[in-house]
Amino acid sequence: MSSVSTASLNCLPDELLVHVLSSLETKQAASTSVLSKRWRTLFAVRRNLDFDDSIISHPEVGEQNMDDVQESFRDFVDKRLAFQGSVPINKFSLIYGDKHDDVRVDRWINTALEHGVSELHLCLTSVTRRLHRFPSNVFRSTTLVKLTLGTNLFIVYFPSDTCLPVLKILVLDSIWFDRIKFSNVLLAGCPALEDLTIDQKSFPGLPNVVSSKTVKSLSIVYKYSADFDWFRTVALDTPNLVTLLYSTYARHRYRHCNLESLVNATLDLHFLENCDEAFEPNVTDLMIAVRNVQMLHLTSSATEVISQCCKGGLPMFKNLLVLVFLGNTERVWKVFLPLLLEHSPNLTKLCLESLFLILQGLYHGTDEDEFDEIHIPRSNKVNMLRIIQCQGTENELKHISHFLLKMECLQLVQVNFSETIVDSKKVQLTEDLMKLPSASSRLTMQVI
């Protein structure tokens, strides 16, 4: 920093200079303290602290030097927290790898809690955490509003007196925890919780019961197939839930699903692979639980699972207004989509994503001149149709034409071409689409 720019910044009032320093990472802000005593004092006023040891982990640093570098990092964190004095901490973020002292890390966390931290983000990876209890004070904080815990972190137990009275957002990223006490201890101790994320793509630790009367947004991503015993049943008791992202393996039974307030659901269901035991999923109760949604997004794997495993029959979706549908098998395209349309009498917006892949599956090994139209209920109320990733094949155009003739309420059709299509072909395809006949006299065609 030049002397001119330093002098210019020194003219700023304390409040504005503190704002400038707060926009820098903690280590960058610390380096400015050598410029003047005033800056050193203002640096201590920072209320957002972030420490990340990944910025010191460079390949060119040898193994012998790495211990010294990490010790230097630990000393920096110690000194910075000691420098905080009585100034409150709003946000504390710590990203720290394997080779660390759990006792010292616990002290850092407790220091942040003692300073009334409202946002705590911890990304700790440590094999020693398997035998070390996580600081229990984290689960007794009266100031935490947002808590993020990760990754590959082991939490041996939740304190019986867990109480996070103002916590609104909880994110668990690859965390091992006591699944039995997850709802009746942890969630029960979060009376203000509104947003819950459980992301366990490659790590065990998914509760088979999620129960909360306050959670409005729930995201569950779980792809750890080795944890088989916990896949037989699941319960989602969240009566005030509004938004759900559910990406995991289909279960044998959904024994209690209370989702009566749900408005928006994204389902990404998968078949359990490489399973030695007989395992037959049944998603009937799950589909019944989400039947009142207004917006439904189904991935290609979800449509496959539901088409085969909704053994009690598909419920009516009387409130469904928006449907995003993916699929790539003949059964899904010819049987499940028409059935879902019939069971969605008030649907107004339909989005078909990667239609080319769907048609590849449908027409694989058949004569492309043979057009097998998809049944569209005559009573459909769809007024907006969106086709995403259109490749402009002949069969795609035939199906789009079929939709235009069968959806009499259509007002808007949006066709998003694939990025792989050259501009000259886009021009020709746009002309072809504009010439397609329609049953609706109020139709507008948009090509993107």
Swiss-Prot record:
Q: State which residue ranges cross the membrane.
A: none
Q: Which PROSITE patterns match?
A: FBOX
Q: Note whether Phosphoprotein occurs among the keywords.
A: no
A Pfam family cross-referenced in the UniProt record is F-box
Q: Can you give the residue ranges of the F-box domain?
A: 6-54
Give the record's keywords alphabetically.
Leucine-rich repeat, Repeat
Residue windows of the LRR repeats: 117-141, 143-165, 190-213, 228-251, 290-313, 421-443
Protein name as annotated: Putative F-box/LRR-repeat protein At3g44810
